[in-house]
Amino acid sequence: MHEQEKLFQEESRIKVTDLEHRRKINYSLMQSDIAFQKGKNVFSDLESARKKAKNIKWETIEHLNKYLLEFEKKFTERGGKVIWAENPQQALDAVLQICKQKQAKSVVKSKSMVTEEIHLNPFLSRHGIDVVETDLGEYIQQLSGEAPYHMVAPSMHKSREEVARLFHDKLNAPPGLAPEELTLFTRQILRQKYVDADIGITGVNFLLADIGAVAVTENEGNARLCTSFPKTHIAITGIEKILPSVNDLALFWPLLATHGSGQHITVYNTIFSGARKENEIDGPEDMYVILLDNGRTNILADVTARESMFCIRCGAC
């Protein structure tokens, strides 16, 4: 048995007997299901919408090479830079090289599962670069020294009392803050982090082949701030995130929001199409997109496993 698998089994046996942990998880799942049951009413025929999305993803994955090359062509025409990474180390080296070129000492980050996949944060920390998670749930996990618990709700297993104690212990926040007060307290800390950051790093919800752009959907606005204040924006994504057209977002964004959080649409939906142009007054001076393989082409070659690349990371399962 692999050492990591052995450790997982040992820790999971302990966790399943933790009744308080189970209570918090069951509560979170119940709230998610209630939100989904309300939110799905935005679709007149949800099952047909899901089938249509699956068909689009099937066609895209079947012609993945074509759409990725189209994205690269369009994105570079807009002044963006595309980096292909076969494995995590190549992606990490690319990020580090950019940081060195920009003499970066601080990085702000929005939620990204692919950066968890390549273990970006500890890598940058080992090279003397300060990395701050700006999604509230991710920030809580970072302060706790823990990985995200769930791809949509990273700290769903923590109670408000636990978070209040954590903020008091780690950030010297007043004891016993309510959730709204904790949010305001975090905002005050992170605002200065955005201003001071040299580089902003985001994940990607969808790559748009026809216009050569990156689509990011969020509820807190932190991804926009990560890309607005720093002079350099790095977006890191798996190669399977591609969609043929910007028009597909009319289907995929509501599907993602409904299944992820029960919303009709998330609060902030942004399309990034490259670095700031000469006549534009905001945005990064440089934008990079790192396209990560890390075994995805092996999955693509496996007919039985290929369907897993249709996943849009809504977290509903």
For every predicted segment, state its role.
Residues 305-317:
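Cysteine-centered iron-sulfur cluster-binding motifs in ferredoxin-type domains/subunits
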Residues 1-306:
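The feature marks the mature, well-folded catalytic cores of soluble enzymes
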